[in-house]
Amino acid sequence: GERYLTDREVAELLRVSRRTLQEYRNNRVLPFILLGGKVLYPETGLRGVLEANYRKPLE
């Protein structure tokens, strides 16, 4: 099944602050689920965003 990550896990993974994650949520940059006041991020959704924004290095 789907794996869901917490704010802390995603902040560590992306090396950003939890406040930056809040901005990403506000601007709908990252997919998330709000469940009972807790924010969770689907791992496959995060991977999709990262892959969609991947830029190849210049040669």
Predicted regions and their residues:
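Polyanion-binding surface elements
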Residues: G1-R19, E23, A52
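Flexible coil/turn residues that form the inter-helical turn or adjacent wing/linker of helix-turn-helix
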Residues: R3, R28, V39
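Extended rod-forming repeat segments used as scaffolds/tethers
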Residues: L14, L30-P31
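The DNA-recognition helices of helix-turn-helix-type DNA-binding domains
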Residues: R28-V29, N53
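Short Lys/Arg-enriched helix C-cap and helix-to-coil transition segments
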Residues: I33-V39
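A short, Lys/Arg-enriched interface patch at domain edges and termini
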Residues: G45-E59
